[in-house]
């Protein structure tokens, strides 16, 4: 047993020292140094008597903590220190780098030695055993032992008792030795990590100091751009600096409010539309002052009619330091938003005004709405008399001149409830999926108000959005618009209103120069729930063309001017078809013919076809990202060609050549659709089928019309073998008012197997071709287009005019009966795409352009000939030229 007396241990096992008289000099290797502070204590025998131990008593040796302090630390990396008492946190072992280890004393009081150490009796004379007793207390671990423990330490720095016991048995050590080695090693690693972190922090501190010195030197050298003198006054007191900051802020507030009052007041005696609450919100100072150099109108992204006054030297002072924390980051993020906090109340007031105007326009009749060609067209002059918009950018002179206005209204019943419709309108991605053939791009720039429910977009939601709308032809420029979208629920009527209104002054830096800029006047839809999951939608579309419009081809002048290209009827027809398609996707009682066996395979096939439609529509339109080229200088040439380099998944990688042509045909769009959607009739067109046959192997119905479906066709089923199968994915869609689509693309058998197995089909490459057909009247009442053998041309008087009241406003034929006739023809857009080269960096060969141009011309000629043949020559011939 071990007994503890003060700073010494009594070990009964040291019987070898029995013959010698124990003294202080014999017990310790170094002489004792008397402590004056303890002189009285040591001399007082009554306080604590001290007697030498007899020979039978154990030898006194110092505690291991004291022994550690007296030992000279060995610097060999293979030594480790072990203590009889477990030290918490490895205290004291870190100084020895975990290299020394004391041997334990077993129950028989015999010291343990490593294999290469000699026994103490053989290594030392017996007379020197007392002086060298401490050298028997440690030994060096072998290189093998250290290597094994290091290997386990890398895997598990904190081994449990079982792991330590197993390792000690393998290495011939005691578990306590293994335990203390790991403890010392962890302490050593922590110390090394602390030193490394300290070095990194010191380096960062030095960099920050150098940056601070550099910025201070730059501030001292600031020169006023107006007078050329130093902009910093070194002798300025802190109080004076604060006064100048406050003075600059008040000047900025005064100038900004003056600009806002002038801008939104309307001038000419009109009362300002700003309410007291809006003014109080606008005049609220920001939480952190911006640098005075930025205290002009450029702080706000809006465009103001007046500029801030030029500041002199006295106004340029060192900017206040903005603390770097989450609040400062949020403030800087808010400053980058188009709508600042002080402007939000104004936008909310405008949203309420727009919602009220939309509701009144939906309820109004004549004289606001005039029926022309079966559609309701807005009388723009009557609208201007009935409704006034508080923020009129065109009248203020900073929004650009209005070249033309379009206003239409329509209503329909869709197979979707109001909640799902509202959710789709408030999500930019879902909105694009709901209108794939008209919305090319859409994004939400800023969420101004989240609505009534916290964190959920619902009633009261106010968004700032940007969109690019397209017509499926490169001959009609895409339109880009930045607008606010406001959603409000009328609990009394049980209806929802989605209203868009112009973002006057907030679209700075958001618009592209390559597309037509539009101003979206209060427009939108009112959604009323009906039984069985249906909804009734009343749609109002009101757009203004800003600035100078690009000249249109004669075939499109009347069509675009009447509002048919971007009007309410087209929006509603697309909405009806997509809702019908989504309902069929969710239905489980529709029988699918062919190889489609599971609901997952059916859903994946519909997703793949939807992506094919979206890709086709985006690739044949005049989007701002595409540049189209005419191959001739003739104004009658309607073929446009473009190339693009693709490296993204979903389409073939390489150089893609696209050719598109749009022409007017004197056949109804249903006649043309039936010809192109029927694969058996299309096979008669040699240019489209290459003489091959098509056999349907799968069919998915996605609408009430029998031609609203998705088909998987096998090309030349009789000739190709099972090892060489060619497949064609086709979707056809039609609407009586909105037009028709026939889109198809070749797919690999492996891709179809991936789709059928339920895997993600988004990476399957598709290069779609197809046709877009829209009902339209003849481009001119006096002349119709003529189809030649080489190209498609359109002849007419070329004098189509555009005015603010669609359609064409000509005094000579304002009351002409032809103005009220329904469409007697259609616009056919043919789009073809080929992979010109599989290398994205390859140069385009001119022969490829010539070949695809000839292919498009021949396709239009064969389609026209087939339509004439099917019509039997009666009512199908184009009108002769005048």
From Swiss-Prot:
SUPFAM superfamilies: Bet v1-like, Homeodomain-like. Residues 133-143 have a biased composition (Basic residues). InterPro entries: GLABRA2/ANL2/PDF2/ATML1-like, HD, Homeobox_CS, Homeodomain-like_sf, START-like_dom_sf, START_lipid-bd_dom. Residues 107-119 have a biased composition (Basic and acidic residues). Residues 340-584 form the START domain. GO terms for cellular component: nucleus. Residues 134-193 bind DNA. Residues 200-263 form a coiled coil. One of its GO terms (molecular function) is DNA-binding transcription factor activity, RNA polymerase II-specific. Residues 104-144, 782-820 are annotated as: Disordered. Its main location: nucleus. Keywords: Coiled coil, DNA-binding, Homeobox, Nucleus, Transcription, Transcription regulation. Residues 782-816 have a biased composition (Low complexity). SMART domains: HOX, START. It is found in: Nucleus. Belongs to the HD-ZIP homeobox family. Class IV subfamily. This is Homeobox-leucine zipper protein ROC3. It comes from Oryza sativa subsp. japonica.
